[in-house]
Amino acid sequence: MKIANSITELIGNTPLVKLNRLTEGLKAEVAVKLEFFNPGSSVKDRIAEAMIEGAEKAGKINKNTVIVEATSGNTGVGLAMVCAARGYKLAITMPESMSKERKMLLRAFGAELILTPAAEGMAGAIAKAKSLVDAHPDTYFMPRQFDNEANPEVHRKTTAEEIWRDTDGKVDVFVAGVGTGGTITGVGEVLKKYKPEVKVVAVEPEASPVLSGGEKGPHPIQGIGAGFIPTVLNTKIYDSITKVSNEAAFETARAIAEKEGILVGISSGAAVWSALQLAKQPENEGKLIVVLLPSYGERYLSTPLFADLA
């Protein structure tokens, strides 16, 4: 019988789909990896399961442990799903500016939500989570997605291998937004190991260009541009960085839905905008550009991305 023992067994093996109308007249082929096919509707399901599994194997958590994590949303949803399935209590700290849908989803899975000031960004959410662990070290466990090696490792073992397998090794360029840095690190390292000439492109908000050496700043591209260089990010793995404006990210996310029938979030818009610029360049003629799209657009209906549709 083809019956999964748990919802977490359905994480991974997400599909690749070619963009058609958005790439008309461009020199390269662009394929997008749809991470919203994961059961929690985002790429973060992968690291949520990996971090909880790692903590279980290391004996760091038990049924009395309260798992606490700082997250801009999708990691929280992934953790909430995994914790619900495995019977753990979960508390999530997140900036108050995150979308209404994400907050409701977390509560729907039974997670406790602790909101921090928007102006403090992810750094404020992380500080709050750490303060809870420091105050109750025997009760709280923090997976620390920005520092946890299980984050890039699950992308080495799963995401990268899926891309290599599904493109028959023909991938030439990999594009991903950088939040924790786990995806671009894990996927980039493996693809370059298999095919050293693969180019890896990091995407960050123009309004918070920390990877490019600029100043951090507030921006609406949820999930990327944390405002600091995460521990798990291998800053040597990407060949170039694309800075994307808020407007370009929003417009491209809307265009993906309207022209390709693929409903995605804001950071997916940023990543595809970057890929489309690359696809225009003569040196990429005939090449295959793979773009990771982290999450589903329905999670952003209350944000400025789709707010004017109401």
From Swiss-Prot:
<keyword id="KW-0663">Pyridoxal phosphate</keyword>
<feature type="binding site">
    <location>
        <position position="267"/>
    </location>
    <ligand>
        <name>pyridoxal 5'-phosphate</name>
    </ligand>
</feature>
<protein>
    <recommendedName>
        <fullName>Cysteine synthase</fullName>
        <ecNumber>2.5.1.47</ecNumber>
    </recommendedName>
</protein>
<keyword id="KW-0028">Amino-acid biosynthesis</keyword>
<dbReference type="InterPro" id="IPR050214">
    <property type="entry name" value="Cys_Synth/Cystath_Beta-Synth"/>
</dbReference>
<keyword id="KW-0198">Cysteine biosynthesis</keyword>
<dbReference type="GO" id="GO:0006535">
    <property type="term" value="P:cysteine biosynthetic process from serine"/>
</dbReference>
<dbReference type="InterPro" id="IPR001216">
    <property type="entry name" value="P-phosphate_BS"/>
</dbReference>
<feature type="modified residue" description="N6-(pyridoxal phosphate)lysine">
    <location>
        <position position="44"/>
    </location>
</feature>
<dbReference type="InterPro" id="IPR001926">
    <property type="entry name" value="TrpB-like_PALP"/>
</dbReference>
<dbReference type="InterPro" id="IPR005859">
    <property type="entry name" value="CysK"/>
</dbReference>
<dbReference type="Pfam" id="PF00291">
    <property type="entry name" value="PALP"/>
</dbReference>
<dbReference type="InterPro" id="IPR036052">
    <property type="entry name" value="TrpB-like_PALP_sf"/>
</dbReference>
<feature type="binding site">
    <location>
        <position position="74"/>
    </location>
    <ligand>
        <name>pyridoxal 5'-phosphate</name>
    </ligand>
</feature>
<dbReference type="GO" id="GO:0005737">
    <property type="term" value="C:cytoplasm"/>
</dbReference>
<dbReference type="GO" id="GO:0080146">
    <property type="term" value="F:L-cysteine desulfhydrase activity"/>
</dbReference>
<feature type="binding site">
    <location>
        <begin position="179"/>
        <end position="183"/>
    </location>
    <ligand>
        <name>pyridoxal 5'-phosphate</name>
    </ligand>
</feature>
<keyword id="KW-0808">Transferase</keyword>
<dbReference type="GO" id="GO:0004124">
    <property type="term" value="F:cysteine synthase activity"/>
</dbReference>
<dbReference type="InterPro" id="IPR005856">
    <property type="entry name" value="Cys_synth"/>
</dbReference>
<comment type="similarity">
    <text>Belongs to the cysteine synthase/cystathionine beta-synthase family.</text>
</comment>
<comment type="pathway">
    <text>Amino-acid biosynthesis; L-cysteine biosynthesis; L-cysteine from L-serine: step 2/2.</text>
</comment>
